[in-house]
Curated annotation (Swiss-Prot):
The protein, known as: Steroid Delta-isomerase
Keyword entries, A-Z: Isomerase, Lipid metabolism, Steroid metabolism
Taxonomy of the source species: Bacteria, Pseudomonadati, Pseudomonadota, Gammaproteobacteria, Pseudomonadales
Source species: Pseudomonas putida (Arthrobacter siderocapsulatus)
One example GO MF annotation: steroid Delta-isomerase activity
CDD domains the UniProt entry points to: ketosteroid_isomerase (cd00781)
The reaction(s) this protein catalyses: a 3-oxo-Delta(5)-steroid = a 3-oxo-Delta(4)-steroid
Protein backbone atom coordinates (compact mmCIF):
# COMPACT_ATOMS: atom_id res chain seq x y z
CA UNK A 1 0.00 0.00 0.00
CA UNK A 2 1.03 3.60 -0.50
CA UNK A 3 1.36 6.30 2.10
CA UNK A 4 -1.47 8.85 2.27
CA UNK A 5 -1.34 11.64 -0.29
CA UNK A 6 -0.77 15.23 0.80
CA UNK A 7 -4.51 15.86 0.43
CA UNK A 8 -5.34 12.81 2.54
CA UNK A 9 -2.89 13.95 5.23
CA UNK A 10 -4.61 17.34 5.31
CA UNK A 11 -7.98 15.65 5.79
CA UNK A 12 -6.71 13.27 8.47
CA UNK A 13 -5.10 16.04 10.47
CA UNK A 14 -8.17 18.28 10.22
CA UNK A 15 -10.26 15.31 11.41
CA UNK A 16 -7.96 14.86 14.40
CA UNK A 17 -8.62 18.48 15.47
CA UNK A 18 -12.38 17.97 15.05
CA UNK A 19 -12.21 14.92 17.33
CA UNK A 20 -10.16 16.75 19.96
CA UNK A 21 -12.67 19.61 19.84
CA UNK A 22 -15.61 17.31 20.60
CA UNK A 23 -13.61 15.21 23.08
CA UNK A 24 -14.09 11.89 21.27
CA UNK A 25 -11.19 10.07 22.91
CA UNK A 26 -12.01 6.65 21.48
CA UNK A 27 -12.12 7.98 17.92
CA UNK A 28 -8.84 9.84 18.46
CA UNK A 29 -7.15 6.67 19.71
CA UNK A 30 -8.49 4.73 16.70
CA UNK A 31 -6.62 7.17 14.44
CA UNK A 32 -3.33 5.78 15.80
CA UNK A 33 -1.42 2.72 14.59
CA UNK A 34 -1.08 -0.07 17.16
CA UNK A 35 2.65 0.69 17.62
CA UNK A 36 2.39 4.49 17.40
CA UNK A 37 4.37 6.93 19.50
CA UNK A 38 3.36 10.31 20.94
CA UNK A 39 5.75 12.99 22.21
CA UNK A 40 3.60 15.68 23.82
CA UNK A 41 5.31 17.99 24.31
CA UNK A 42 8.25 17.08 22.09
CA UNK A 43 11.28 16.25 24.21
CA UNK A 44 9.30 14.31 26.81
CA UNK A 45 9.74 10.52 26.89
CA UNK A 46 7.64 9.00 24.08
CA UNK A 47 4.34 7.33 24.87
CA UNK A 48 4.20 3.95 23.09
CA UNK A 49 1.22 1.99 21.81
CA UNK A 50 -2.51 2.54 21.76
CA UNK A 51 -3.09 1.57 25.39
CA UNK A 52 -0.68 4.20 26.73
CA UNK A 53 -1.88 6.72 24.15
CA UNK A 54 -5.49 6.16 25.25
CA UNK A 55 -4.50 6.78 28.89
CA UNK A 56 -2.68 9.97 27.83
CA UNK A 57 -5.77 11.35 26.06
CA UNK A 58 -8.11 10.32 28.90
CA UNK A 59 -5.92 12.24 31.33
CA UNK A 60 -5.59 15.29 29.06
CA UNK A 61 -9.11 15.50 27.63
CA UNK A 62 -11.19 13.62 30.16
CA UNK A 63 -11.00 16.17 32.95
CA UNK A 64 -13.08 18.96 31.50
CA UNK A 65 -14.20 20.82 28.43
CA UNK A 66 -11.41 21.33 25.95
CA UNK A 67 -11.90 23.16 22.66
CA UNK A 68 -9.54 22.93 19.70
CA UNK A 69 -9.35 24.70 16.35
CA UNK A 70 -6.86 25.08 13.55
CA UNK A 71 -5.14 28.47 13.47
CA UNK A 72 -3.68 28.00 10.01
CA UNK A 73 -3.68 25.51 7.15
CA UNK A 74 -2.39 21.96 7.50
CA UNK A 75 0.93 21.62 5.71
CA UNK A 76 1.41 18.19 4.16
CA UNK A 77 4.18 16.42 2.30
CA UNK A 78 4.14 13.68 -0.31
CA UNK A 79 5.57 11.12 2.11
CA UNK A 80 2.64 10.77 4.53
CA UNK A 81 3.68 13.56 6.90
CA UNK A 82 2.12 16.84 7.93
CA UNK A 83 2.23 19.72 10.39
CA UNK A 84 -0.51 21.99 11.68
CA UNK A 85 -0.86 24.98 13.96
CA UNK A 86 -3.81 24.92 16.33
CA UNK A 87 -5.10 26.32 19.58
CA UNK A 88 -6.47 24.41 22.54
CA UNK A 89 -8.72 26.27 24.97
CA UNK A 90 -9.14 24.79 28.43
CA UNK A 91 -9.32 25.54 32.12
CA UNK A 92 -5.91 25.07 33.76
CA UNK A 93 -5.67 25.39 37.55
CA UNK A 94 -9.10 27.05 37.59
CA UNK A 95 -8.13 29.68 35.02
CA UNK A 96 -9.37 29.78 31.39
CA UNK A 97 -6.30 29.40 29.17
CA UNK A 98 -5.32 28.93 25.55
CA UNK A 99 -2.36 26.89 24.34
CA UNK A 100 -0.90 27.41 20.87
CA UNK A 101 0.55 24.17 19.50
CA UNK A 102 2.13 22.79 16.35
CA UNK A 103 1.64 19.06 15.81
CA UNK A 104 3.80 17.09 13.41
CA UNK A 105 2.41 13.71 12.36
CA UNK A 106 3.67 10.84 10.26
CA UNK A 107 1.08 8.42 8.90
CA UNK A 108 1.46 4.78 7.90
CA UNK A 109 0.23 3.15 4.71
CA UNK A 110 -3.18 2.54 6.33
CA UNK A 111 -3.70 6.24 7.08
CA UNK A 112 -3.10 5.79 10.81
CA UNK A 113 -0.89 8.08 12.87
CA UNK A 114 2.52 6.44 13.32
CA UNK A 115 4.18 9.30 15.19
CA UNK A 116 2.85 12.52 16.69
CA UNK A 117 5.09 15.24 18.05
CA UNK A 118 3.50 18.26 19.73
CA UNK A 119 5.56 21.43 19.93
CA UNK A 120 4.62 23.71 22.81
CA UNK A 121 5.80 24.92 26.21
CA UNK A 122 4.59 27.28 28.91
CA UNK A 123 5.61 30.25 26.71
CA UNK A 124 2.75 29.23 24.39
CA UNK A 125 0.14 29.34 27.18
CA UNK A 126 -1.97 32.47 27.61
CA UNK A 127 -4.70 33.38 30.08
CA UNK A 128 -8.15 34.05 28.61
CA UNK A 129 -10.96 36.14 29.99
CA UNK A 130 -13.78 34.02 31.45
CA UNK A 131 -16.74 33.75 29.09
Amino acid sequence: MNLPTAQEVQGLMARYIELVDVGDIEAIVQMYADDATVEDPFGQPPIHGREQIAAFYRQGLGGGKVRACLTGPVRASHNGCGAMPFRVEMVWNGQPCALDVIDVMRFDEHGRIQTMQAYWSEVNLSVREPQ
